[in-house]
Amino acid sequence: MIPRYSRPEMANIWTDKNRFRIWFEIEAYALEAFEKQGLIEKGISNQVFEAVGDKKYDFDVDAILDIEKTTKHDVIAFLTYLAGIIGENSRFVHMGMTSSDILDTALSKQLDEACEILIDDLKRLLAVIKKRAFEHKDTICIGRSHGIHAEPVTFGLKLARFYAEFDRNLARLEAARKEIAVCAISGAVGTHANVAIEVQDHVAEKLGLESETISSQVIPRDRHAMLFSVFGVIASSIENLATEVRHLQRTEVLEASEFFSKGQKGSSAMPHKKNPILTENLCGLARIVRASVVPAMENVALWHERDISHSSVERMFAPDATVTLDFALNRLINVVENLLVYPQNMQKNIDQMGGLHCSQRVLLALIEEAKISREDSYKIVQTNAMKVWEEGADFKSLLKNDPLVSSKLTDEKIDSLFDDSHHLKSVDKIFDKVFK
């Protein structure tokens, strides 16, 4: 996590101050539950809240870290620091609890807060893609398979595909958020022997989390693995859209391009350059997010009721993945919103192949109307198509001058096979399905 690829809204979730605030709230809400159980006198939790007051937003991080140098234990260091603020009531804090009750519940809360931001990012991205998709619903361009001209699509359809992909990602993230947003206050090995289930339920409700069904010393890591897997899928979708823009911005294609601002420079050596730097950057950032997926999977298999092998990994990749993904989504929003589209170049690229994009329509006409076998029809069409590739001839003219075709299809029929509106006849229905 570096400032260059961070937004403060997300980065602030992972600050020490925010982490210690959540730790305090977990401990204080547990005191409320202890009062309800009659384990401590009523009013103690209020005394603790009042003693801390607004300090919970501004705990002395350096002081806590100094204590940790001695304790070699972050939670004990925090509890020692907290005791200095709340005094005698500190003896009731953390009763029957273990460090993972604090660490895991806090991590769940941080990931829940991160998901809230990411869900908003996705909704804003979807709105921008939808707007541009309708803007170019009927903007015809060539579709490509294997990088080679295939048949026409519309630029709006391209964007509609990405809309549907990110809409699926939104549903995945909402489901994964629900799965990760859990609280576990279950004690040393998850048995609730020394801290009642009701304490966990109360803290969960106060934090806006669900109460974990069953835990060991830790929240099961399959929950985290699911969330980071979804992060990886979203990152791949970002790269998918970014790669499309990069290809379309190639000089010999130039059907769309990133906005190039006044004063922007593309190369220190070549003043003419306008490079797709934002989408290239997004492809790189996607790799960072995906790099968290395998470690998250490997964290699932902890020893018995818990070992600490997951901890160092999560301290690194939880902030890195969420901050990077948030930045990437916001950069992608900017790219799509300001994307330059060149319909004239799209038509020019269609025309440069001499009508080959209509080869399937000719094939089907020979099969269905001329009653020629599929094998023979394919051979006739391919023979003429190869002349276009090799000689630069016009496909339609070749067909009209081929006796095998002209004896079966009239010139008017052949002309109709090159009407590109045929390729757009289902666009409205597709849009209705995507944007229903």
Model regions and ranges:
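Short amphipathic alpha-helical segments with heptad-repeat character
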Residues: D112-I119, K123, K130, A160-Y163, ...
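Generic, well-ordered alpha-helical scaffold segments in large soluble proteins
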Residues: A33, Y81, I85, V128, ...
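A helix-coil-helix interface module used to build multimeric assemblies
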Residues: M1-S186, H192, I197-H202, S211, ...
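Glycine-rich cofactor/substrate-binding loops
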Residues: M1-I22, I26, I67-T71, M270-K436
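Acidic, glycine-rich loop-and-beta core segments that form the ion-binding/anion-interacting portion
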Residues: Q200-V293
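Conserved helix-loop functional segments at active or binding sites
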Residues: E135-D138, R172-A175, E179, L209-T213, ...
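Short, well-ordered beta-strand elements within core beta-sheets of diverse protein domains
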Residues: L157, A225-V233, R361-E369
